[in-house]
Amino acid sequence: MQVRTLLTLGKKKVIGNRQCILSLYRKYSNVQSRKAEDQLLRQIFDDQNIAVNQITKRNGIQGVGLFRNHFLSDKDTGFLRLAETASEKCKAVIEDLLLEDTEDGSIVVSKFDRISNLLCSVIDLFEFVRCAHPDKMVVMKAEEAYSYLFELMNTLNTHQGLYEKLKCSLQQTPTLKDTDPEAYTVGRVFLQDFEKSGVNLESSKRNSFVKKSSESATLGRAFFNNSMNRPQRYLTISKQRLAGSDPYFVRSLSKNDKNFIMIPTVGYEGTQALISVANPDVRKEIYMEGHKGTVEEVELLNSYLRSKAEVAKLVGKSSFADLQLIDKMANAPKHVVEFLENLSLKNSSVLKKILNNLALMKKKELNLNFLPSFDVWDREYYTARYKQSLINQKPSLNPSITNYRRFFSVGTVIQGLSRLFSSLYGLRFVPADISPGEVWHPDVNKVNVYNENDHVMGVIYFDLFARTGKTDGAAHFTIRSSRELDLTSFDDSISLGFDDATNIRVKDNKRYQIPVISLLCNFVRSSGMDPTFLDLWDVKTLFHEMGHAMHSILGHTKYQNLAGTRCATDFVELPSIIMEFFMSNPAVLPLYARYEGTEIPLPVQVLNHHNMVENSSAPLDLQSQICMAMVDQLFHSKVVLDPSFNSIDEVTNVTRKFSGFESAPPAAWYLQFSHLYGYSATYYSYIFDTVLASLIFSKLFAGNPLSREAGEKFRKAILRWGGSRSPWECVAEALEQPILATGGEEAMRRIGSEGIKATSTF
């Protein structure tokens, strides 16, 4: 059944489905193309009458398969056949590489990247399908194919023949660093990945490495699952002790009997209790109960930490942090610690003022004649009240009021992002046709990203609304990254079933693979036919993820292994965090915050007031993150191998020194620190990139955040390189501080001492 719609383009009214609308738009666009496509962009996200896509057959055209891959038009066998094809192509390239009598580093690196592209083009697609597809059978098929290729990838990571070929070629081409620096960088990355996998170890050590790595991965998954699924713990409290607490919260609690109430202490519910309960003694009990750990939980974490340290020792590193940071901007654990110490020192004076103000609030509320201690369990309660007092000063400017959400329809925000990127980089979003079978759900929208010469620079699939079975949170997926194409790589794409007739662009007489991105969010779709309206946190999420997308689209490199977001962990968040600074800037506000169906912008006073309220606790939040990053460094140092290591004692020492709460009691809060699994020794990265983003935003965009000149400088210094250039050189160029170009201890110290310059809402 075709969905009929009424769409107004200027003075013309068009009835039809999405495909008809797009076709008529193209005719109409000869007159007012840019204005028409800008309005249509907003409408395809906001007007539910428009058929976002048609999964059924249209005009006799058969389904093209997910992401226009013809293998995937067959849901039953397509995934495995695609995996098998990629495997066969990889093995053929490997055989050819090992037999080829060449030690030319550039040629060898190019073939390594070809292998990597064959694998990543398919396995990244499978990973996305596992996270997003609503059909459980399709997910199962994708998982089966993913496992098939993952096994091959693990085999290649420990392939001694490939390792020796690469190592020898880099040694035999000493001038490669100067003649082809990008090839040299890619080659070094491949070599480091091999050595991190223990391929260069002698046989018995290599076997131990494989075994210990497997054990560590198992322990890590167990710890992560425990940290994310901790059983709720309750306190039974008499109703009298809850006098003065939030009545809505108290009414929501289970009652043991008419005189006692059960209060949850773990996770989100525990945090709500700390926000809502007025009695400081009860808050302390909630905090302590919610941060208890069993002997088994502590031992699981300790075993996990020891296993990682033992893996590092097998490859000649004194700690897991030393192993992890080899290829990061920080380079060494001591540099991370010095950065965090300097940042903590920079934050200390304003932190003391905030804690003193909160202690004064506590004194007043408890009617004391002395300044009481301000404890860790007081933080949530008084921070919430302090923010509410700021909101109450100007209640008409509170953006949580429902009316203000109508300035943030999904279509308006995405239209605003397109307008922002047009100002900064000369890029714009244009709604694209969707062929039958190309997308996985009717909610999905597709846009092409065009430059000012009307060349397609990238493709973005937006999957923004929550649904059952979809992965939680927000995520940016690179389905295919950019890379320079030659005849062999073009043939590879065709062999893998990709429709590359529409996925190639030409620049300087070179052909490049067009990056394909998918953005996942979990916004709650509006009921009925109204547009979906976002709150400011949702808007922040879109801006953040679009920062990653722009990095993927503008990160043009010769080799896919270092394209876009394939860069150092402590550099990759910089482009996304800087987008949060754009969002918080009053000059950018009219681009993305306009009242439903109009061009009337949100009053700038609302944003300024919101920024002021949120930033009122920013130093507290920063100090908490510094403390967690310090614990992350502690847990990945060699101290965990000491037989006398006691995690709770060590964490208590770090907490008292770096949390802002010098008398914090021993507590096992770190058992809920799930990032110890995914961000081992690199949790500092988000803080580090926030500081870098603030410095770069202040340098380039403070005077005019819509400056094309500044946008071009950011693109040329930061975005275009992906991971093919030293990130320190990128930062040094953007900040015009050559002294930073070599990185190292002094550079980390300088960045930490600078602190956060620009302000972000979040």
Swiss-Prot record:
Cofactor, free-text remark: Binds 1 zinc ion.
Subcellular location: Mitochondrion matrix
Residues binding Zn(2+): H544, H548, H551
A single GO BP: intracellular iron ion homeostasis
Alphabetized PROSITE patterns for the sequence: ZINC_PROTEASE
Keywords for this protein: Hydrolase, Metal-binding, Metalloprotease, Mitochondrion, Protease, Transit peptide, Zinc
Top-level EC class as recorded in UniProt: hydrolase
EC number, as in UniProt: 3.4.24.59
Broad class of the protein's primary localization: mitochondrion
GO MF annotation, one: metalloendopeptidase activity
Active site (record annotation): E545
Pfam families referenced in this protein's UniProt entry, alphabetically: Peptidase_M3
Transit peptide region: 1-28
A GO cellular component entry from the record: mitochondrial matrix
Assigned protein family: Belongs to the peptidase M3 family.
Record-given protein name: Mitochondrial intermediate peptidase
